[in-house]
């Protein structure tokens, strides 16, 4: 798979302008997507309300708009010519969505609807949306495909699914791709947020206290994907021809239990102990991706494995 600075697969999709909007640009994934788009020769306008993102994450080579996308005043600051919108802004924790469901709705659904209307008004060619595995809810112990039944368990999942449905409503006016993100981890993740990001939570606790508190069973399972692989998938979703109208699982297809994650993390922080407590509301017991569509549509066939990804992440945190 192509890495930063290496040639990537050819595409016949031609964007009429080199200007793209990346939302959530001060966040973990959005900042890296923006940097990659700049590297590929695009002019990036980045948007973030800085409620959770960090100014230090924002690439210095982009134009930055600070504001809440649920507010029309922010939308009016966006460029009148734009080829693609890569929408990664939003509240990203299922657990936290129960704290204030209305705020979660504004962050994840109202903001998306506003951006959809903006994208249509300026003739955007491609709208890429950060959806989530949370739309599926509890599923059988088998790889979950995009066309399977959806039944979200959290306010967060409901909001993500609603945004997908808004994109479906406007499908004739806007070419979009729903990226159903699985458990993304890696360098740059917010280590102070202990309510979002399983790998980052466990690694942060291990490094700080050599003690990890696990909310829920060690037999729960997930699909962990390294941030570099996610960035590559987003670039392809924005620029590949023929992918509009797709919903794509962004995972590796590898079933990994919480116990396996803990052993991997403990391998980098000797002497770490583990305490198991009650699960959080709306938490899925287990889920991992069927990646057939990711492989066929976006031609993603190689991924960073968990052991190597955690090694890179741990080294990054220890030297940061």
Question: For each of these PLM feature ranges, what is it?
Answer:
Residues 33, 207-320:
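C-terminal substrate-binding subdomain of Rossmann-fold SDR/epimerase-dehydratase oxidoreductases
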